[in-house]
Amino acid sequence: MILFTRLLAVSLLLVSGAFAKFQEFDDSDDVAEYDDNDFAEFEDAADEAPTLRPPSQQVPEKEDEIEDDDEEEEEATVELEGQEEFEEDTEGQEGDADAEPYDDEEFENYDDRLDTGTPNKNNDPITIVDVPAHLQNSWESYYMEILMVTGLLAYIMNYIIGKNKNSRLAQAWFNSHRELLESNFSLVGDDGMNKDAVSTGMLNQENDHIYNMWCSGRLCCEGMLIQLKFIKRQDLLNVLSRMMRPVCDQVQIKVTMNDEDMDTYVFSVGTRKTLIRLQKEMQDLSEFCGDKPKSAAKMGLPESMAVLAEMGEVTDGIMDTKMVHYLTNYSDKIESIHFSDQFSGPKIMQEEGQPLKLPETKKTLLFTFNVPGSGNASVKDMEALLPLMNMVIYSIDKVKKFRLNREGKQKADKNRARVEENFLKITHVQRQEAAQTRREEKKRAEKERIMNEEDPEKQRRLEEAAQRREQKKIEKKQMKMKQIKVKAM
């Protein structure tokens, strides 16, 4: 019973306390806001703190009221002290937060708003800096791009113009020479694309500045290759270099003769400067024409021309009246004429020394003509080369008819034997080294085959066979040495 009365008293106290707390709210207060605010009671206590009056204005009251006031003042003082401590803690937390570094991107344009909202007299005045000239949006800022685009356009225009001009010059040459070529050759313009030879009647373009034409079907020769080598007019850099060093367009004609239609000799005529260069570069001229180019003034040719010949008889036989006429009247267009039964092209330069075999030779007539105009050739200049093609046709017939006498033939044969002997002497050491290398490789392969044999009996038989072969080689060498000694005695 006593326990029940105590519980009832405690519950009544709790209900009365809750009712008193509820009475503290105004009608306008938000209950949820009060529940969420943990420090609401401290704020209410601060609001209800009594204001102290001066001692002169205080009215004496009863002792009970004075004691009650003292207790309330002590409670208010405690509450105010707690609130002040809480405010100090919050201020310390805010100071710590201010001390921490913050991200500039998170507070972008924050300083600008502060400056516009609260003007500061201590800030420096705003100064507008001039934009540098190279950053301004004007045509002067793009001078490099303008130069590059201009250069590219100039290169493209030069390529188109140069390519078209080379094509026009080649077509002009062919139109002026077509009738002569078709009257002397049954096949004109074979491109080699078909198994059977077919006359296309047109030039073959190798690239933008070289045009080819193959003609065949004529007596005395296997065929004739014509090459039109124009200046690289499509290349702007080449055009600029020609301003410092002018060059000419060239027409090169190579006639391959039949073996029975040309005798054994080497002959060349042309400008002195060109012959000196060819004598150094060409294999046949350097071997069979050891003398320096001789002047052709005795034969009625201009002073600028010279002659290289294996024998004097060849010069007298080739340089007849008609050939002298062609060379004299068209000396400004003729750079070189080269007749050779030992033609193999330029010298072969190898890093490891001389080649072990003589180069393959063919009986060839080689003509090199310069197009007039000094690099500024026109259609009329290409048509003016027609008489030189007549000279080529005449030279083919002339070479077929010309024959050396008996002494000249013997001298030519001696010269060829001498050249071959000199070549063998030069390459003798290299051929010995090559033969020794082949023998060593053969022995090494034989030893490897014996070592790889798994059957001991078969391996022994192979070793005995190899020894017998070596013994036979030694006996043969000894027999040769004995025969040489007997002949010497």
From Swiss-Prot:
Gene Ontology MF term list: calcium ion binding; protein folding chaperone; ribosome binding
Biased composition (Basic residues): 479-489
Localization terms from the record: Endoplasmic reticulum membrane; Rough endoplasmic reticulum membrane
Residues exposed to the Lumenal side: 163-489
GO biological process, one term: protein insertion into ER membrane
Cellular component per GO, a single term: rough endoplasmic reticulum membrane
Signal peptide: 1-20
Family: Belongs to the CCDC47 family.
Name of the protein described by the UniProt record: PAT complex subunit CCDC47
Protein species of origin: Xenopus laevis
Primary gene name: ccdc47
